[in-house]
């Protein structure tokens, strides 16, 4: 960044903002880069400002019982704020004085007053000087106030961030990220813009008093008629404002519904295409858009009347002020002109400045109070510790996540009693408040000596993470004692990476020790990974470490914890993302050897780790189930240990599976003194596990990648969803967010008893900060969010490091920091995260305007209609002027002219009544025309917005995946939320305002030019100067605005990153470093914003200077060239003053239109995306010349009838090559094989080898070359939709959209209820659907959060059965399933798809056994394609993956199927829980 010229600028340069000239020149000539921006003055740096405010706030906290943030702000900024307020007032006073001089000038032309004629020229000079003084006072004052507003915002931003880092975990659970971002963005932006208006709260009343005094002198009591009308008008506008808010609130709900479905569609676009649901989704979204647009139109009409009321009020104010006086006493022209000028200023003060100022104060004080409350929230306290202590001790420790739960618990119980809940009802329910009453840990005791390893195991949600939080001081014990030495290092369960290099992430502010660093890297197996990067350990990781795989992130997090020299190491499930082999090696080399003499507490679920630990603590529902050594465990709890030991290769399971089994086992053995309990009782019992939910609610412990939150299980009455629903003041969303749950708990919930919680389920929930820290991100819940699975930017990772999940969720993989807003509040969030879809020019092109205008044929007619009405108004005025000029002199025909719509006012001394009748008649006609000029325009522009939305939606749905893969989900969603909101709300009225203002100016210039042709000569250069100046300024200002938006994103991204790693930050004491980083991000944004404000002021001042010159010219031309007659001079000068303020407004309005039209440019960019249907897939020859031949798709006769093709499901694949994006690396190369009808083929390969990619290629979702035939029909001889309908798909990431069960199973409404129920029976879904009220009409929300992962898989299965597909593609259907659901899916597959071709990508051995052929993919190619016997005989991947004992088990299958074309699948014995095993290769 360059040094700012401001530092060396002279006073004159600062006054006229000339110091910004170099940047304006540069921006006009070339594209601005960040390096071109000037550094901020030291007075504006976040460090200085935050220190100043923090000091005053601390003083306030220390000195008072009720500290007020406004007092601290006052002490920091009051005097400068007052100084600029006085300048502003003096500038405004000049406005009030100008009409006096105008009156004197007009009076000097009265034939009876020749004595004053000689001083007219001096009065003219005085009038011009007032304009110059006003310009020199107002602009520095407004800029100064904007500057103070900016400084206040920066100081408060910093204070909020510092406070966030100190908040206790209890408080963090009550605040959602959405609220925090809203606190920073929404509330604080009010200061930037609003502070300039704040002073009008006292300036406007003073101005009104002064003006009323001056008008009283002219018109006596009748002056108050005009004022009365203005006050009534202001109240009328307030009423309209309230009505508008009502419509907007109603509309917000509709927008929400549309955006929820749109976001679900965008996030699951791959599934939408695979299912051929494009038309169904389009129809669904368009229907929601229709109802939304009805309310949009109502709100727009109200806003239109509100806006036009201001324009049309000018005539009435003058009319009502003058009429009573004229009727009683008659009137002279000088008074009328002076009154008109006074009334223009008066109207501005009463209807605009004062209401805006009141609104600003209301908003600002509200924001300050919110921030004040936030700054007084409870902070976390580090535990008191003793450095001489060597052991770690916990004595009788009990802890709650909530405080004050007792009272709430009582209230909930009382409420339940009132509802007369029967005790013997099997469907027990608990409210979220009963959860509050459950301690997360109770009576925990243990003691470990220095150098010992304590392994903590337990059921899902038993309190394992909470135990570590207690030791770190994040959770305060309500009773009991904790002792340790205080030097702690911590590794979080969810690996957290800060922006920076790998080295910085590991050292993390601790002093650098080369030997220690190398040892740690070796022990954590990072050497090989680091060597792959060209920059080695200096490679920079973006937000969230996006260039890394989950395993690499986990190892870096562990390395960070190990590198710090501490007495106690807390390791919270550090091996979650690692494969079995790596985990074993790291456990040995790192935990057992490198840290052998350190005290370690390891949360784990592996038997091997328990065996090696010095002590074991097993937790269940917050209590200690067992504490002691492994041998004691075998002696004291023989049932439990033998149960776990009885699993073959328990440690080989994925961590999710292990936890599922562990939870179930603990449940069974912990009931009623370990007495044997029947399965049905276990089912019942599972509803009582409030402890599990209580802990789960907070920590989402052992959450899988796609974890979701469940509601409390409740009785069938929807009202009882929350125990104390009606009486609680706490908002509903707060309580609903409390219970996160993960897929792994599924095995525990009885399959049939997911009770529905009624319509209230549809209330939006939001995610607390604490949930986000523990990664519990809801599926499909948030609008501004990506899937958690894809936290890595895949395009940057070497191909070998891609995980299956990466590849499958490729299109969402490039998001940054958007998984954050759980309440859909796009107003708060849309501005916070900049999406870099900004490859559009800095200024909107004419082509965009032309396309926009011609989009709807009526729009051109409406614009012509506006012009015709305008010409009628000007013509009427000119006719009246012509009549006036030809009136005999003795009648003293005089005329006045009202500001806005060219109404001519004729009043004579002799026939006041008669003339007023004519005047009112003409004015009313023009008024009616004027009113209806705008309505058709606003109506038509909203229709244009509707067309744009429809075209864009269609384009996105029809775009090829290769195009969508290059876009961010957040970027696409911003088009549908932010840009469509601009097209609906802001653009129509801004265009109307601009056209209105432009016509007023043209009309005024026309009238003045008719009266005094010389003045026309002065207006031509003025308008030319204004057009050139605007073009010059726009180039730079739009680029600065763009840079400012880009600069805003890092602030919020940093906030989110800090919150995710807050526990790590605090454990390592790195808060000061992160505050510095935050201040850097703030300063970068400030530099852009300050420069934007300065250039804007430069522009406004130049415009004002041009008008001052114009006014001087007009004044002297009219004074020197006009002969007798007050009328002409009066009209000319009044209009010239008018032209000045209106044209400035018009210029600003034109800049607004240009900014808003950028949204239209972005929407057009999406509309112009290529479509999928036209993409040939044959071989490269077909489209070498880049031209797409429509002739290529020839309707194939076999496909004419849906029931004929495909009949058998035979597939032939020839030379298939697949890429994600055009010109990218080939993920699969020259794949060739064939599949017989009805055959089952298993895909094998390492993670990231391209198994899921192959399935996507079959569906033509990728850029493919080569050929595939199904039953002899080639894929480029039929349409894309027909091809995809041949396949049934069960993807890894299940897509459930917001809608009824029926809609989810059959979005095109092709099947009757009877057929749907029949299929539901086949796949085992009937019992699930029947649990819900409304059955098939029950509405699923939030990605089907009330369904388990298994139920969702069954939904996919049902869709495939309904589609009558002959080929079924399964992508890891059992990834997160418990044994029970898995059996249901296996059974359904055997029955419903007995004669279908099945292609299976799976990690479980027993699922693979049912396949006749196996395709082994390695290094993007087919390595082997053989039967299971051949694979077991050779040295293949499959053989390596299976242990010797398993091979012995499998032999019977091998031998029996040797000579059969197809084994008897039905004869395979059902697997028991113990036989489930993973084959992650």
UniProtKB/Swiss-Prot annotation:
<feature type="domain" description="ABC transporter 2">
    <location>
        <begin position="1211"/>
        <end position="1444"/>
    </location>
</feature>
<keyword id="KW-0597">Phosphoprotein</keyword>
<feature type="topological domain" description="Cytoplasmic">
    <location>
        <begin position="1152"/>
        <end position="1481"/>
    </location>
</feature>
<keyword id="KW-1133">Transmembrane helix</keyword>
<feature type="binding site">
    <location>
        <begin position="458"/>
        <end position="465"/>
    </location>
    <ligand>
        <name>ATP 1</name>
    </ligand>
</feature>
<dbReference type="InterPro" id="IPR050173">
    <property type="entry name" value="ABC_transporter_C-like"/>
</dbReference>
<dbReference type="Pfam" id="PF14396">
    <property type="entry name" value="CFTR_R"/>
</dbReference>
<feature type="topological domain" description="Extracellular">
    <location>
        <begin position="99"/>
        <end position="122"/>
    </location>
</feature>
<comment type="subunit">
    <text>Monomer; does not require oligomerization for channel activity. May form oligomers in the membrane. Interacts with SLC26A3, SLC26A6 and NHERF1. Interacts with SHANK2. Interacts with MYO6. Interacts (via C-terminus) with GOPC (via PDZ domain); this promotes CFTR internalization and thereby decreases channel activity. Interacts with SLC4A7 through NHERF1. Found in a complex with MYO5B and RAB11A. Interacts with ANO1. Interacts with SLC26A8. Interacts with AHCYL1; the interaction increases CFTR activity. Interacts with CSE1L.</text>
</comment>
<feature type="topological domain" description="Cytoplasmic">
    <location>
        <begin position="147"/>
        <end position="195"/>
    </location>
</feature>
<feature type="lipid moiety-binding region" description="S-palmitoyl cysteine">
    <location>
        <position position="524"/>
    </location>
</feature>
<feature type="glycosylation site" description="N-linked (GlcNAc...) asparagine">
    <location>
        <position position="900"/>
    </location>
</feature>
<dbReference type="GO" id="GO:1904322">
    <property type="term" value="P:cellular response to forskolin"/>
</dbReference>
<keyword id="KW-0813">Transport</keyword>
<dbReference type="GO" id="GO:0031901">
    <property type="term" value="C:early endosome membrane"/>
</dbReference>
<comment type="function">
    <text>Epithelial ion channel that plays an important role in the regulation of epithelial ion and water transport and fluid homeostasis. Mediates the transport of chloride ions across the cell membrane. Possesses an intrinsic ATPase activity and utilizes ATP to gate its channel; the passive flow of anions through the channel is gated by cycles of ATP binding and hydrolysis by the ATP-binding domains. The ion channel is also permeable to HCO(3)(-); selectivity depends on the extracellular chloride concentration.</text>
</comment>
<keyword id="KW-0564">Palmitate</keyword>
<keyword id="KW-1017">Isopeptide bond</keyword>
<dbReference type="InterPro" id="IPR025837">
    <property type="entry name" value="CFTR_reg_dom"/>
</dbReference>
<feature type="modified residue" description="Phosphothreonine">
    <location>
        <position position="717"/>
    </location>
</feature>
<feature type="topological domain" description="Cytoplasmic">
    <location>
        <begin position="244"/>
        <end position="298"/>
    </location>
</feature>
<feature type="modified residue" description="Phosphoserine">
    <location>
        <position position="795"/>
    </location>
</feature>
<dbReference type="GO" id="GO:0015106">
    <property type="term" value="F:bicarbonate transmembrane transporter activity"/>
</dbReference>
<dbReference type="GO" id="GO:0005260">
    <property type="term" value="F:intracellularly ATP-gated chloride channel activity"/>
</dbReference>
<dbReference type="GO" id="GO:1902476">
    <property type="term" value="P:chloride transmembrane transport"/>
</dbReference>
<feature type="topological domain" description="Extracellular">
    <location>
        <begin position="320"/>
        <end position="339"/>
    </location>
</feature>
<feature type="binding site">
    <location>
        <position position="493"/>
    </location>
    <ligand>
        <name>ATP 1</name>
    </ligand>
</feature>
<feature type="domain" description="ABC transporter 1">
    <location>
        <begin position="423"/>
        <end position="646"/>
    </location>
</feature>
<feature type="transmembrane region" description="Helical; Name=3">
    <location>
        <begin position="196"/>
        <end position="216"/>
    </location>
</feature>
<feature type="modified residue" description="Phosphoserine">
    <location>
        <position position="1445"/>
    </location>
</feature>
<dbReference type="GO" id="GO:0050891">
    <property type="term" value="P:multicellular organismal-level water homeostasis"/>
</dbReference>
<feature type="modified residue" description="Phosphoserine">
    <location>
        <position position="686"/>
    </location>
</feature>
<feature type="transmembrane region" description="Helical; Name=2">
    <location>
        <begin position="123"/>
        <end position="146"/>
    </location>
</feature>
<feature type="topological domain" description="Cytoplasmic">
    <location>
        <begin position="940"/>
        <end position="990"/>
    </location>
</feature>
<dbReference type="GO" id="GO:0016887">
    <property type="term" value="F:ATP hydrolysis activity"/>
</dbReference>
<feature type="short sequence motif" description="PDZ-binding">
    <location>
        <begin position="1479"/>
        <end position="1481"/>
    </location>
</feature>
<feature type="topological domain" description="Extracellular">
    <location>
        <begin position="1012"/>
        <end position="1013"/>
    </location>
</feature>
<keyword id="KW-0812">Transmembrane</keyword>
<dbReference type="InterPro" id="IPR011527">
    <property type="entry name" value="ABC1_TM_dom"/>
</dbReference>
<keyword id="KW-0547">Nucleotide-binding</keyword>
<dbReference type="GO" id="GO:0034707">
    <property type="term" value="C:chloride channel complex"/>
</dbReference>
<feature type="modified residue" description="Phosphoserine">
    <location>
        <position position="1457"/>
    </location>
</feature>
